[in-house]
Amino acid sequence: MKYFTKNFEDIKETQIIEKIDESQNSTSTYINDINYVSTDIRGNKYQITAKLAEIKIENSELMYLSDVVAFVFIKNKDTVKITSNFGKYNSKNYDTIFSENVIVTYPGHKITGEYLFFSFLSNLGTFTTNVVYAGEKTNLFADKIEMNLATKDTKIFMNDTGKKVLIEGTK
């Protein structure tokens, strides 16, 4: 496994393998089993791993990821786990887009959907497309969920104000 560690200033680099993408006529760098860790000044940590990362030379700050697992460790809070089939990670600002079969779990809660935009610097996540929240006693079906991972403050709503969030009791 290869590791990247980023503490907003320092980067430990790993060996990379370059391949030519002949169909796009551009050069990309591919990294297997990538692990990237970022820590902010408050002591919060964001770790993202993927089976495969592609970095295109023309925009090297973006990594296109496959089989993604991420953890958000907020100081003195529960750990949040995020998994998805694909992701796009920005190594400059740590913003990440998770897509296809996105699952977010933390103790007693699970959110699933097809698209999640996550900002580590602001600890905000926005879920869209087929969003389902499952709690210990309630399931919610909505178009959009916005969540602050530090405070766990959550907004759940529909895009069309004429529609309502569907709420089901589970017990």
Residue ranges and their predicted role:
Residues 1-171:
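Mature-chain termini and adjacent capping regions
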